[in-house]
Amino acid sequence: DGDAHLEIRAAHTIKLAGILRREKPGVVLAPSLGENQHPDHWRLGKMVRDAARLARYGGLKELRRSPAHAIDQLLFYSVTPEADPRDVSPVLIDVSDPEIIAAWTAAMAAHESQVRARNYIELQLTRARLLGARAGIGHAIALFPNDPLVFGSLAELTRSARRF
């Protein structure tokens, strides 16, 4: 639809559901649902969430040609702290590897029109350093689960950010 013109439409959501069915991802990342951010971001987050639900349903006429697919986990990210969900504790992902930081920085720099308006790259790297310090690592990003995380055993829980 164009920058700042993305509308929540059933056609968009169904198309995204079709992509999820075709690609069969286990984990899907989407922009957070908080409205205190660019309108395209929260709208896309809502459509991805709804598409994940539609992808697992069998009854939609437009999706009948492909088998249903249920993702394992939907995680939201926020571009700015203002868009962080307030009622969900984040999962912190270690992104300290210099190759990851370089690729992430390059991906952010590709959004030239947006990084000119505000120094989003430095904002994200500063947030990553702060979250990393909180977790005792170099850099971390916060992801917010749509649903409770399920672990097969307590042994899979390696540590918390607090590191009691």
Model-inferred region functions:
Residues 1-3:
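A conserved beta-strand->alpha-helix junction
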